[in-house]
């Protein structure tokens, strides 16, 4: 009997490690692991006895110093072989674009890194594993390996949070159900909107995220300890991990001081210029900003990363009697909010108003006429509050008749008008929530 091979992608959160520990007690398979962690964490994985991995690859050990003599022919054939757009992933990589405040990568450096990554992954896949088990990708190289696995016949089993708190899903693609039943094929529990809203409150993911954000915001001890450890430890990581290029101690400390000041100034600006009370005297469409940088745009919706342009497109597409309300993402506080110039440009658009992050999303959903989102769960929450939604990227709840998956920006004016006339049926939402519960498990990823 052939022993199946399973590859785990471990990014330092121990999720894949603990899952492998549990799985090895139940099945007889060969376990392999790609470990994507900084240098100082390698020792733990080298000495751990939780899982008997047949082989471990430390991701950054496979990446050499960037060089100028890049094998473009290899990268060209790689793209064709795996149907992967490398520049799409590379230019949306937070380490390679404007979100990296410490180092600006050149074209040659990026191509050199891509070449090393792709060649390393091909060598690993030569083992012909049957499964990839991993948390959803955050960085471009993780997503490249995920896509390579699918093309190579390796079945991905990807952990991601459900939109229901304390539950997670295991699917081939994050936020895309493997269960392809339509709404018409599903069973309803005959819940009305009041019952659905009570159910949603019971499993409200926003509260779980909010608790995590508050903990990160208020807890100073871990930050102080991390800062002291950084100051008094050696800093060799900037030499052998491209994610830390440019992170000298002087730059890091200077960046910390500057961003703390910016955070306060930005918060003061929002307090002064954002609406804290919803003015519903005129009907409005609601667009929540996405936290950035995050995979929800950079990977899941890669052509919609410019949210200001998206807001302008929506504003241009509204019926004359409607306004657009835009709300800052509360978790953006963990990124020191956004540049004031970002907010100023939005406020300069006639018929657009920014809502303060402290306003509850539920209160907005009760008063808006339509929700438009690039990605994320707010479109489902809109349906629970009897409101139609438009979404710019693939998400499992787009099977709801009240949710329109936008295929082209040119169709936005027509779709907005059509969606404003769309009625949400409780039976459809009820069926979908049953489907979601069937396809998720009790497990807190946070």
Name each region found by the language model.
Residues 119-181:
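Conserved nucleotide-sugar donor-interacting segment of glycosyltransferase catalytic cores
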Residues 22-118, 161-259, 263-264:
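Conserved N-terminal ligand/cofactor-binding loop architecture of enzyme catalytic domains
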Residues 1-13, 35-37, 106, 133, ...:
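Nucleotide-activated donor-dependent transferases that construct or modify glycoconjugates
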Residues 9-27, 146, 303-318:
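Histidine-anchored nucleotide/phosphate-binding helix
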Residues 312-356:
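Catalytic donor nucleotide-activated moiety binding site of glycosyltransferases and closely related
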Residues 279-308, 313-315, 328-332, 437:
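Active-site donor-nucleotide binding/catalytic segment of nucleotide-sugar enzymes
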Residues 402-446:
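Long, C-terminal catalytic modules of enzymes
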Residues 134-135, 141, 160, 357-404:
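A donor-sugar binding/catalytic signature common to diverse glycosyltransferases
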């Amino acid at each position: 009997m052939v022993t199946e091979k399973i590859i785990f992608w471990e990014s330092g959160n121990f999720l894949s490690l603990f899952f492998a520990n549990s799985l090895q007690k139940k099945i007889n398979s060969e376990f392999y692991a790609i470990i994507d962690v900084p240098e100082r964490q390698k020792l733990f994985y080298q000495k751990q006895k939780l899982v008997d991995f047949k082989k471990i690859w430390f991701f950054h050990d496979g990446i050499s110093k960037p060089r100028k003599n890049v094998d473009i022919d290899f990268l060209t054939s790689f793209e064709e072989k795996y149907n992967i757009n490398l520049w799409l992933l590379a230019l949306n990589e937070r380490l390679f674009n404007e979100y990296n405040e410490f180092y600006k990568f050149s074209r040659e450096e990026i191509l050199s890194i891509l070449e090393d990554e792709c060649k390393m992954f091909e060598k690993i896949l030569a083992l012909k594993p049957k499964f990839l088990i991993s948390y959803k990708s955050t960085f471009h190289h993780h997503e490249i390996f995920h896509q390579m696995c699918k093309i190579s016949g390796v079945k991905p089993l990807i952990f991601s949070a459900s939109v229901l708190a304390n539950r997670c899903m295991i699917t081939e693609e994050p936020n895309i159900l493997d269960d392809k039943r339509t709404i018409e094929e599903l069973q309803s529990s005959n819940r009305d909107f009041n019952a659905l809203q009570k159910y949603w409150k019971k499993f409200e993911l926003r509260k779980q995220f909010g608790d995590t954000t508050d903990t990160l915001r208020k807890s100073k001890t871990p930050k102080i300890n991390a800062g002291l450890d950084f100051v008094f430890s050696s800093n060799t990581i900037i030499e052998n991990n491209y994610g830390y290029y440019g992170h000298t101690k002087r730059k890091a400390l200077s960046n910390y001081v500057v961003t703390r000041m910016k955070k306060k100034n930005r918060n003061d600006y929002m307090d002064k210029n954002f609406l804290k009370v919803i003015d519903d005297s005129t009907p409005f469409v609601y667009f929540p900003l996405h936290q950035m940088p995050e995979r929800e745009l950079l990977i899941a919706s890669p052509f919609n990363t410019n949210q200001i342009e998206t807001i302008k497109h929506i504003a241009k597409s509204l019926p004359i009697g409607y306004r657009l309300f835009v709300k800052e993402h509360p978790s953006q506080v963990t990124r020191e909010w956004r540049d004031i110039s970002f907010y100023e440009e939005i406020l300069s658009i006639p018929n657009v108003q920014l809502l303060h992050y402290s306003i509850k999303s539920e209160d907005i959903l009760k008063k808006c006429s339509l929700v438009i989102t690039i990605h994320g769960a707010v479109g489902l929450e809109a349906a629970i509050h009897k409101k139609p939604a438009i979404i710019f990227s693939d998400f499992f709840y787009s099977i709801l008749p009240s949710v329109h998956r936008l295929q082209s920006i040119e169709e936005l004016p027509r779709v907005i008008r059509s969606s404003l006339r769309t009625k949400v049926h409780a039976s459809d939402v009820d069926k979908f929530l049953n489907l979601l519960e069937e396809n998720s498990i009790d497990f807190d990823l946070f």
